[in-house]
Amino acid sequence: MILELDCGNSFIKWRVLDSGSASASAEGVVRSDLALIENLSALPRLLLTRCRLVSVRALEETSKLVEALHEAFGVTVSCAAPAREMAGVRNGYEDFERLGLDRWLAMLGGFKLARGACLVLDFGTAATADFIAADGEHLGGFICPGMPLMRNQLRTHTRKIRYDDAAAERALERLSPGRTTVEAVERGCTLMLRGFVLTQLELARSYWGDDFTVFLTGGDADLVVDAVPQAELVPDLVFVGLAMACPLS
């Protein structure tokens, strides 16, 4: 069995693949290393043989997780690393090592699936957009606050904005002007994300006309999916790239 991990700023996304299979036999999202170990330990008949991960966390944090996995399951961990070029994609950053690994792997996965020009939109703690031309050249990208950051900034810096996650979910049942604070905040932030998406689509069309593929990924991609009907929703796009960056066969 192969354990795959995407260690983001706020969550750890994990999945277990049966050897020789590309489909997950178990998967989940947790907030801490301890919760990850507990979730995995609770799986029946778990026999991990290999592990690969991508992390945007500090090296010390990542190293502690690698050690914990080895101690708990006796597994060696392969970690994705920055590259100037891989699988036909050329990193467009002036300093290629400064490009977030999650973005890099999503681009690798997107280019593999598209087999041509693509726009990769990822909605996590931050919202990111990356443009990959048909020849594999990464033209650059954009980063802006994602839904969690926008929501938390308003909650933190505005005294009267207080509500729970259940209220937030109910508020997003429609996008008409809000008649409560929670509706106004949640719908306003969602519309900002959609505006970000539409701007990226306009720029992509200026590059490639209609000859490109749009990929949506990340935990909040469902907030914008109906605004981009031509897009492909690929929740595990980073894992597609991770398998390319850390082949285990």
Curated annotation (Swiss-Prot):
One of its GO terms (cellular component) is cytoplasm. Its main location: cytoplasm. GO terms for biological process: coenzyme A biosynthetic process. PANTHER family: TYPE III PANTOTHENATE KINASE. InterPro entries: ATPase_NBD, Type_III_PanK. Its cofactor is NH4(+); K(+). Its EC number is 2.7.1.33. It comes from Pseudomonas fluorescens (strain SBW25). The active site is at 102 (proton acceptor). This is Type III pantothenate kinase. Keywords: ATP-binding, Coenzyme A biosynthesis, Cytoplasm, Kinase, Metal-binding, Nucleotide-binding, Potassium, Transferase. It catalyses: (R)-pantothenate + ATP = (R)-4'-phosphopantothenate + ADP + H(+). Homodimer. The keyword Transferase applies. It is found in: Cytoplasm.
